Swiss-Prot record:
It comes from Alkaliphilus oremlandii (strain OhILAs) (Clostridium oremlandii (strain OhILAs)). Keywords: Cell membrane, Membrane, Transmembrane, Transmembrane helix. This is UPF0316 protein Clos_0555. It is a multi-pass membrane protein. Its main location: membrane. HAMAP family: UPF0316 (MF_01515).
């Protein structure tokens, strides 16, 4: 029973510290220094406990298996958590040629700020709709665009910072 608890401790510690590492890296990229440092402190403390447990029992391959399994699962869980947290801002480009004025009106009625640029694609004139938004509202953008134009081309890029312009909250 004690050995089983040891494996579980190693697994959970690795799962936790690797998940935290994923979130910490996102905070670093977004310029959130203090949050990243605090997460890093807790993360490395947990890591030291896990590696200490493994190194004290290197003759037991199940310790290594628990460590590796926790690492792999931690990567998965970290990415899952990051997606659910949906931190930060993004810039979406919606390219369409179908009743663009109506699409722009729908997007603005939902609460998005939209800038329209005329472009020329392979098959003629297209309109590029630039939309800056919080990541947590991306599914609402997709839904609104999909309801209007199933063939619209949408690209999304991360925005480290947004300053000025129309950046309102979503309407219910």
């Amino acid at each position: 029973m004690e050995a089983l608890l040891g494996y579980l401790l190693i697994f959970v510690a690795r799962l936790t510290d690797v998940s935290m590492a994923t979130i910490r890296m996102i905070m670093v990229v977004k310029g959130k220094r203090v949050i990243a440092a605090c997460i890093g402190f807790v993360e490395v403390s947990i890591y030291v406990v896990a590696i200490g447990k493994v190194l004290s029992g290197m003759d037991n391959p199940l310790n290594v298996l628990a460590y590796a399994s926790g690492f792999a699962t931690g990567n998965y869980v970290g990415i899952f958590l990051e997606e659910k947290m949906a931190l930060g801002n993004i810039i979406a480009q919606v390219i369409s040629d179908y009743e663009v004025e109506k699409l722009v009106e729908k997007l603005r009625n939902v609460g998005f700020g939209v800038t329209v640029i005329e472009g020329y694609g392979r098959e003629g004139i297209r309109y590029i709709l630039n939309v800056s938004l919080q990541r947590k509202h991306l599914s609402r953008l997709y839904q609104t665009v999909e309801e209007h134009d199933k063939k619209a081309f949408v690209t999304v890029t991360d925005a480290r910072a947004i300053r000025g312009g129309y950046f309102a909250g979503m309407k219910k």
